[in-house]
Regions:
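Activation on beta-sandwich/Ig-like modules and their edge loops
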Residues: 2-168
């Protein structure tokens, strides 16, 4: 009987340890999510994800085109009107319209196509990678940039822990 009691104690302790480990992982994930990435240059807005060969995510008009996601890591809305986005360093190819806001701890997706009319960034991204995507302030000073990488059709690129864009 002692053996059965000891086995029950061991099983009970293993369950308790598993619950504690899961709770510790959850708390760690929450804390890390709310921290700013080390590579963000001290700005609360940065390029967080890029799609260079979109075959899976149509925009509200049903168009499949490249897109760039801007993330705001701060607890306040960020007015991005007058800022620029480009696929070339120093060239502000797309100017965010006045009144454009990236919500607090939120995202803004910019659709990119030189062929579409309306509110599109007027450039496409190379599918093969090696292109620098830049977010610039109203004076065209670079706040964030990232070099695209080659990836499969329909696969997005996300920022790795070192800030590089890597296949998701």
């Amino acid at each position: 009987m002692t053996n059965a009691k000891e086995k029950k104690k061991i099983v009970l302790w293993l369950i308790v340890l598993a619950i504690l480990a899961a709770a510790a992982f959850t708390v760690t994930a929450i804390v890390r999510h709310n921290q700013r990435p080390a590579w963000d240059g001290g700005y609360s807005v940065h390029i967080s994800e890029v799609m260079t060969d979109n075959k899976t995510c149509p925009n509200g008009e049903g168009v499949l085109c490249d897109w760039i996601e801007i993330e705001n890591t701060s607890s306040k809305d960020f007015s991005i009107g007058g800022y620029y986005l480009s696929d070339e360093t120093g060239k502000g190819k797309y100017c965010f319209p006045a009144g454009t806001v990236v919500p607090a701890r939120g995202y803004l997706v910019v659709w990119c196509s030189p062929d579409e009319e309306g509110d599109y960034a007027p450039f496409a991204l190379r599918k093969a990678g090696g292109e620098t995507v830049c977010l610039m302030n109203e004076n065209r000073a670079v706040l964030d940039s990232a070099v695209t990488a080659a990836c499969r059709s329909g696969q997005s690129l996300v920022r790795g822990s070192d800030g590089a864009l890597i296949p998701a």
